[in-house]
Amino acid sequence: MDLTPREKDKLLLFTAGLLAERRKAKGLKLNHPEAVALISCAIMEGAREGRSVAEMMDAGGQVLTREDVMEGVAEMIPEVQVEATFPDGVKLVTVHEPIR
């Protein structure tokens, strides 16, 4: 299987997102990389499903709460930016204060 560097990055992010999802389901508090991966994956999947940029900006802020992450992690992530593939092309989605 030949993947472009961009496809490899997306696959790595998706794998990290799955790991974070499993840890969250076990009741474990997520660290910084896990939180970013989970939020990013949610945005990428929503975009792939055909949701709008505005919907994904809103949804990205509903993935995690402060109770879901380790102490101090929410403050470490002032925003998350991810390039997601929408039906009409690739767009940059920015979520400010994603962990509320």
UniProtKB/Swiss-Prot annotation:
Q: Which GO terms describe its molecular function?
A: nickel cation binding; urease activity
Q: In which pathway does it act?
A: Nitrogen metabolism; urea degradation; CO(2) and NH(3) from urea (urease route): step 1/1
Mind telling me which Pfam families this protein's record contains?
A: Urease_gamma (PF00547)
Location comes to: Cytoplasm
Indicate yes or no for the key word Hydrolase: yes
Instruction: Please name the GO terms of the biological process aspect recorded for this protein, alphabetically.
Output: urea catabolic process
Which GO CC annotations does the UniProt entry carry? cytoplasm
Q: What class of enzyme is it?
A: hydrolase
- InterPro entries per UniProt: Urease_gamma (IPR012010), Urease_gamma/gamma-beta_su (IPR002026), Urease_gamma_sf (IPR036463), Urease_subunit (IPR050069)
Q: Which UniProt keywords apply?
A: Cytoplasm, Hydrolase
Q: Supply the CDD domains for this chain.
A: Urease_gamma (cd00390)
- Catalyzed reactions: urea + 2 H2O + H(+) = hydrogencarbonate + 2 NH4(+)
| Enzyme Commission (EC) number | 3.5.1.5
Instruction: Report the HAMAP family cross-referenced here.
Output: Urease_gamma
What protein family is recorded?
A: Belongs to the urease gamma subunit family.
Complex and partners: Heterotrimer of UreA (gamma), UreB (beta) and UreC (alpha) subunits. Three heterotrimers associate to form the active enzyme.
Please state what the protein is called: Urease subunit gamma
Organism (species):
Alkalilimnicola ehrlichii (strain ATCC BAA-1101 / DSM 17681 / MLHE-1)
